[in-house]
Amino acid sequence: MVYPVVEAESRVGFGKGFARRARAAGKIPAVAYGLKRAPEHVLLPAAQMSLIMRRANALLQLKIDARESLVLIKQVQRDRIRNIIEHLDMLFVNEDDAVTIRVPLRFVGQSYAGTVTSVENYSVAVTLQVSQIPEALVVDVSGLQAGRRIFASDIALPDGALLVSPPRLLIAKVDPVRRATQESPPD
């Protein structure tokens, strides 16, 4: 499988001041760890990473000092006001490793006429091989009638994937549309 390659610079400075200067220069401070390797503190190009981060559970080839390693973005710290990435935690992985991650759900279709679908959870936790991580799991609500509930156990998973979320975790429910009642005007 082909993954985007990101050139990373080894990071020598630490602390809030260094991180601010790095972000001002268009770099994102990050750390990669796992696979019984020493943590590697790096700087990543902000523009390239913001494009890669549009996908959930993004995998990429991290190129540090002429050696490439496959990494999974584990945690993203964002500045909510300026909507910028402040820091990334990444996990070194092999394609055949099994990882437990939260996979987003994509809802398709429309429920039966006269009903409304209420989404209770937008992701589920699953364990699967790194090479099989989907961008999203599809939940089809087409033609569901009032009173129907969709649980985590109802979601179709990729081959070899195991559901970690509780099987009875409510994902969505279909309820009848409530009609507005006309109230008599006050006297």
From Swiss-Prot:
Gene3D superfamilies tied to this protein: Ribosomal protein L25, beta domain, Ribosomal Protein L25, Chain P
GO molecular function: 5S rRNA binding; structural constituent of ribosome
GO-annotated biological processes: translation
Statement: the UniProt record of this protein carries the keyword Membrane: no
Keyword vocabulary terms for this entry: Ribonucleoprotein, Ribosomal protein, RNA-binding, rRNA-binding
InterPro entries: Rbsml_bL25/Gln-tRNA_synth_N, Ribosomal_bL25/Gln-tRNA_synth, Ribosomal_bL25_b-dom, Ribosomal_bL25_C, Ribosomal_bL25_long, Ribosomal_L25_dom, Ribosomal_uL5_bac-type
Pfam family, one: Ribosomal_L25p
Entry GO CC: cytosolic large ribosomal subunit
Domain of life assignment: Bacteria
Listed PANTHER family: RIBOSOMAL PROTEIN L25/GLN-TRNA SYNTHETASE, ANTI-CODON-BINDING DOMAIN-CONTAINING PROTEIN (PTHR33284), RIBOSOMAL PROTEIN L25_GLN-TRNA SYNTHETASE, ANTI-CODON-BINDING DOMAIN-CONTAINING PROTEIN (PTHR33284:SF1)
Subunit (UniProt): Part of the 50S ribosomal subunit; part of the 5S rRNA/L5/L18/L25 subcomplex. Contacts the 5S rRNA. Binds to the 5S rRNA independently of L5 and L18.
Similarity section: Belongs to the bacterial ribosomal protein bL25 family. CTC subfamily.
Function: This is one of the proteins that binds to the 5S RNA in the ribosome where it forms part of the central protuberance.
Name the record gives this protein: Large ribosomal subunit protein bL25
Species: Tropheryma whipplei (strain Twist) (Whipple's bacillus)
Upper classification of the organism: Bacteria, Bacillati, Actinomycetota, Actinomycetes, Micrococcales
Annotated gene: rplY
